[in-house]
Amino acid sequence: MKPRWGFRTGLTDDGYELTLLDWAEQHKGTREYVAFAAKCWPAFQTEFKFVPCYINSRLTGMGIPVSCEVDIYGVLSEYIGVCVSGAPVTLLDINNTVPKSIYDKSICGKCSAKLTETFMGFHCGNTCSKLLKDPHMGYQLIMKRDLEPELPEPDITRGTMEGNIKPGDITFF
């Protein structure tokens, strides 16, 4: 997969996604590739009534790098990763300390990785679903606590793409 543009097969009629694709197509000029560094919170949820994570996930699956929090260096890193790997990439906050209890419960015996060879990666949900084992939709817990604490169920904080990264070779940079 190389970064590409104009790919429309399989898109839903989601207005936000189509608007982003149309806007980029109309404004890319002579450029061949496009990337987005979006301000995904906190104003997005209150204005549009959902989080954009799952749409960002879909865009990264099309070869269009997307970073959150207007992370210009992050989206540049994703773009380089797509060019080098030919596959969707993700941008995660990495914690190299996996608690032994989590390792014992969720990792040990399921693969050959030792505790010292594991890490935890987190982000709200812009990772392409093709990179996830059992991907599913969720909601952004931190935003829910801040923007809708009185609601028993999430409303405007729904839309994250969640799941564990599939086992396999990875590259960090």
Label the predicted regions.
Residues 2-173:
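Anaerobic metallocofactor- and corrinoid-dependent redox/one-carbon enzyme cores
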